[in-house]
Amino acid sequence: MKSLLILLLAAGLGSAQNIPYPAARDLIARVQTHLKHAADFGNHGDVKKVKRDEKEIERYRNAQRKASDFDRNLSKGKFDKGELDSLIGDLKNVIEHNTLESQDRDALTDDIRDLRDFRAQ
């Protein structure tokens, strides 16, 4: 039984090593979490509801779509620098034009920095 457990654990670790771009995929997951949190601003807690216009909503959708597309391609082992640049541009649009809490603005700004660092590697 113990050897079976060790074998299963080793197989799991071996398959985890085959994931293309694991650090980048973790970064994209973090970006998506931060975008979702920012998009939820005004929809929970005691925060006065923020009226969203269609352009704000579309900026969130564009950034989430780009992040998802980029992650999908990374999972297939494909890295597209232009696609990453497009994602960074959409994140900048959210930061520059959407109503955000300071912590969300800071998190997304940090994400852009980290994406640029990844791109430079």
Predicted segment positions?
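Short, Lys/Arg-rich, disordered C-terminal segments of secreted/exported proteins
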Residues: 94-120
